[in-house]
């Protein structure tokens, strides 16, 4: 298991004395230690975010190790075969993660600061740096893994597993993997940047080094949603801790993002795992014993809830004076107390009950993530914080969803790819709307939930009339892969794209994602490769839709789409919220401009009033004269 205490000097509630982290960090360094929690349970020294192993004194040279791993593949980790496998699967959220062909375009040509950018964190096998996309200026975190420090096939398999897992994840509270590059010496994982910093550091800033119960409940709710999502996809995290949750922004009400899947693993229901991994202060007793399943993640949530409410870890292990053997004994017997009294007397009984239900030694008696979401503490606080506005769906978003189903499959696909390029500030309003529809807290939207929300709002008169069939049509249009039973986070964003302020940065990033081999244009094959064989409509249908797209950009005989063509197609796809074909955000901006510059008239009472003029948005003819490119 990873050693936490070796790097962080923090005793009791002195959480503010944490050392060795950067303010904007996405990782923490951990010393290579042979400490143990007693018995034969060895501490895994793998680092939090570059968790792929350390040098073990192998007699092979660096070059010999890399050559051994490459074998028949040109890639150490088999990146080329992973690219081919994804084409078969047909999962857009997976294929949308760009994997540069081994030794293809160097990452240094795409990003500024790969080797010189500010270090956000360090680990045993590399660094995490802040970089900027050269063409757009968008900032990302790049995890640079030194392949020369990977000694065993097991460590290599763990790295492959991390990449495969991150490619499949699409949840508002889980960090997004954007791109993967490989050089002769390193693997680069380009990830969404979370400038809000670690939950560990944010806790350090709280009065008394602890959160209020209301804020703690908000954060735990997000953690559980991410854990439930992982488990529903057959993934166990195995290293949940404060450092592995980042805030997406510096705002006080910022959402959490789960990170670091270096120890994560796929599992089958009922499967038992035996390798001892994790962090001493959050590790579950069954992990120490060497026989566990996905419910070890729920134990960690119980520990984190306790810690957020008090600043203390219930069993020690947070760099305090207690030896790891004592921490081990406390965990194995679930020995902890709701102390000191001056803190816990202000904490509700339902919060204590929530923690107690998770910190149960027998994992079979521990609730699942879904069951934990329904425990009274979370439901009570959710009800207290809910307002009427939390139930009302924005009619403009619903209108966007209705219009989305009228687009062709290719148009919808382009919107989906574009959705992965949006920054947090561009989708913060959609995040709220998504949460209203995610009524079961799964991080996805079921057909039942969509019907419940839309039909209830329609009945209340806020959406006009709407039938069950219309809701089903909306649901089916949002699903990229028709065998899926739920709508994913970015599928929702794609459908409501017209509510976002799209700019040239997004268009360029999306175009480059489609033009994965850097031709300078997009072909039908690029589209088909992105969808994969299993995700494709019939090929003749795709070719017909492609031909229609060509007509829309006035290229009936052309076989490819340039960046300018792509921008025009996206503009038309987004133009769905007004009869003139202009997106809502543009109309609102235009109204604001008119409000600023319209001349003033004086009425009989000498009060300044705006001159009454016809709105150009009500006059398609005048609009065509102003914006001829749109018609």
Regions found by a protein language model. Name each.
Residues 127-148:
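Glycine-rich ATP phosphate-binding loop
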Residues 415, 444-462, 487-499, 523-536, ...:
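Amphipathic regulatory helices of Ca2+-sensor modules
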């Amino acid at each position: 298991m990873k050693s936490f205490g070796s790097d962080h000097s923090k005793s009791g509630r002195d959480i503010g004395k944490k050392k060795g982290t950067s303010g904007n960090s996405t990782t923490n360094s951990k010393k290579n230690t042979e400490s143990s929690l007693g018995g034969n349970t060895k501490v895994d020294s793998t680092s939090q975010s570059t968790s792929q192993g350390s040098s073990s004194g192998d007699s092979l040279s660096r070059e010999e190790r890399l050559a051994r791993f490459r074998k028949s593949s040109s890639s150490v980790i088999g990146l080329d075969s992973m690219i081919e496998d994804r084409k078969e699967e047909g999962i857009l959220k997976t294929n949308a993660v760009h994997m540069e062909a081994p030794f293809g375009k160097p990452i240094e040509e795409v990003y500024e600061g790969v080797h010189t950018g500010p270090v956000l964190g360090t680990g045993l096998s590399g660094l995490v740096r802040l970089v900027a996309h050269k063409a757009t200026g968008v900032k990302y975190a790049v995890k640079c893994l030194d392949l020369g420090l990977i000694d065993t096939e097991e460590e290599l398999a763990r790295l492959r597993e991390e990449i495969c897992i991150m490619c499949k994840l699409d949840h508002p509270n889980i960090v997004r993997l954007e791109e993967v590059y490989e050089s002769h010496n390193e693997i680069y994982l380009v990830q969404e940047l979370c400038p809000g910093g670690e939950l560990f550091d944010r806790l350090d800033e709280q009065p008394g080094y602890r959160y209020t119960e209301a804020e703690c409940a908000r954060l735990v709710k997000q953690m559980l949603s991410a854990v439930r999502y992982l488990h529903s996809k057959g993934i166990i995290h195995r290293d949940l801790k404060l450092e592995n949750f980042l805030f997406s922004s510096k705002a006080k009400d910022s959402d959490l993002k789960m990170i670091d899947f270096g120890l994560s693993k796929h599992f089958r229901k009922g499967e038992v795992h035996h390798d001892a991994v994790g962090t001493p202060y959050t590790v579950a007793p069954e992990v120490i014993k060497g026989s566990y399943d996905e419910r070890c993640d729920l134990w960690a949530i119980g520990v984190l809830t306790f810690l957020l409410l008090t600043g203390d870890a219930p069993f020690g292990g947070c760099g305090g004076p207690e030896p790891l053997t004592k921490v081990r004994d406390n965990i194995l017997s679930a020995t902890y107390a709701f102390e000191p009294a001056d803190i816990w007397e202000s904490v509700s009984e339902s919060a204590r009950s929530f923690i107690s239900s998770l910190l149960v030694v027998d994992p079979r008696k521990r609730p699942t993530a879904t069951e934990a979401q329904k425990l009274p503490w979370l439901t009570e606080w959710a009800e207290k914080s809910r307002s009427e506005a939390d139930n009302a769906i924005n009619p403009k978003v619903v209108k966007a969803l209705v219009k989305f189903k009228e687009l062709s499959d290719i148009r919808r696909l382009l919107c989906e790819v574009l959705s992965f390029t949006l920054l947090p500030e561009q989708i913060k309003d959609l995040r709220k709307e998504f949460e209203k529809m995610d009524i079961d807290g799964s991080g996805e939207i079921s057909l039942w939930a969509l019907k419940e929300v839309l039909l209830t709002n329609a009945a209340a008169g806020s959406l006009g009339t709407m039938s069950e069939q219309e809701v089903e049509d909306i649901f089916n249009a949002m699903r990229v892969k028709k065998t899926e039973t739920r709508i994913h986070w970015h599928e929702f964003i794609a459908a409501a794209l017209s509510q976002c302020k799209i700019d040239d940065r997004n268009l360029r990033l999306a175009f480059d994602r489609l033009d994965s081999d850097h031709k300078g244009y997009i072909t039908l094959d690029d589209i088909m490769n992105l969808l994969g064989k299993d995700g494709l409509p019939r090929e003749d249908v795709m070719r017909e839709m492609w031909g229609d797209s060509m007509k829309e950009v006035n290229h009936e005989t052309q076989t490819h789409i340039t960046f300018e063509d792509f921008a025009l197609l996206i503009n038309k796809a987004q133009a769905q919220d007004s009869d003139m074909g202009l997106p809502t955000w543009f109309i609102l901006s235009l109204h604001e401009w008119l409000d600023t510059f319209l001349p003033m008239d004086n009425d009989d009472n000498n009060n300044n009033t705006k001159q009454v003029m016809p709105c150009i948005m009500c006059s398609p003819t005048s609009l065509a004269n102003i914006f001829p490119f749109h018609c």
